[in-house]
C-alpha cells in the first residue's frame, strides 16, 4: 500500500510529489519524453500566438460580444487551456518509460525538470503579455481587470520554482491512463 510518509495528512493543504526513485530516474533517462519535448521544436512557440489570435477572432466574430469582452474571453480561454494542459493532467499518454512520469504534470516534465530554460521562460512570459494586452484593450475596466489578474495568477503560480512538484489542495489528480488511477498513491 505504501509507507505512512507518502500518505497525505487530512489537514495538509500542500502535498509534495516524492522524489523519483532510482528506477524512475533510469526510466526517465532511457528514452526521449515525447509528451513534453515538442515545446522545443520549431513552430511550437508560434502555435501559441496562432491559438491566441484564432481565439480572439472567434470571440470577436460573435455578434453580441463586445471588443472588451472578446479580449477577456480570449485571455480566460487561453489561460484555462494552458492550466489544464500544463498543470492539471499528470502522466503521459504513451507507454515508453515504465511509468516514470505518471506522477508529474507536463510542466514538471518539460526540459527534464530544469528551471529557467528558454521554453519555460517563453511559457511564463506569454500569459503575462496576454494579460497586459487584455487589460489594455478592456480600457482598464476594474471588473475585467480582476477577472484577468485572477486567471493570470492561476496560471503563473504553478509555474514558479517554489511550487515545483507540489500539489495545492490535491487538485491535480487526473491521470491520462485509466489503469494508473488506483495503482499510484497521489
Curated annotation (Swiss-Prot):
Stretches that traverse the bilayer: 43-63, 69-89, 143-163
Major site of localization recorded for this protein: endoplasmic reticulum
Subcellular localization, as worded in the UniProt entry: Endoplasmic reticulum membrane
BP terms from Gene Ontology: ceramide metabolic process; intracellular sphingolipid homeostasis; sphingolipid biosynthetic process
Gene Ontology terms: cellular component: endoplasmic reticulum; endoplasmic reticulum membrane; serine palmitoyltransferase complex
Listed InterPro entries: ORMDL
Membrane topology, record value: Multi-pass membrane protein
Pfam families associated with the record: ORMDL
Keywords, in A-Z order: Endoplasmic reticulum, Membrane, Transmembrane, Transmembrane helix
Name of the protein this chain belongs to: Uncharacterized protein C119.09c
Species per Swiss-Prot/TrEMBL record: Schizosaccharomyces pombe (strain 972 / ATCC 24843)
Lineage, top ranks: Eukaryota, Fungi, Dikarya, Ascomycota, Taphrinomycotina
Amino acid at each position: 500500500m505504501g509507507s505512512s510518509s507518502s500518505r497525505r495528512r487530512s489537514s495538509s493543504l500542500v502535498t509534495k510529489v516524492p522524489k523519483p526513485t532510482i528506477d524512475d530516474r533510469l526510466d526517465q533517462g532511457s528514452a526521449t519524453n515525447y509528451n513534453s519535448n515538442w515545446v522545443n521544436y520549431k513552430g511550437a512557440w508560434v502555435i501559441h500566438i496562432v491559438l491566441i489570435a484564432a481565439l480572439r477572432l472567434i470571440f470577436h466574430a460573435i455578434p453580441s460580444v463586445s471588443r472588451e469582452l472578446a479580449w477577456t474571453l480570449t485571455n480566460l480561454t487561453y489561460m484555462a487551456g494552458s492550466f489544464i494542459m500544463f498543470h492539471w493532467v499528470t502522466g503521459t499518454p504513451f507507454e515508453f518509460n515504465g511509468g516514470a512520469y505518471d506522477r508529474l504534470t507536463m510542466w514538471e516534465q518539460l526540459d527534464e525538470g530544469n528551471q529557467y530554460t528558454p521554453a519555460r521562460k517563453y511559457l511564463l512570459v506569454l500569459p503575462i503579455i496576454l494579460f497586459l494586452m487584455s487589460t489594455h484593450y478592456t480600457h482598464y475596466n476594474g471588473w475585467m481587470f480582476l477577472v484577468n489578474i485572477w486567471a493570470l495568477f492561476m496560471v503563473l503560480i504553478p509555474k514558479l520554482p517554489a511550487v515545483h512538484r507540489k500539489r495545492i489542495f490535491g487538485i491535480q489528480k487526473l491521470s491520462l491512463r485509466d489503469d494508473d488511477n488506483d495503482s499510484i498513491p497521489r
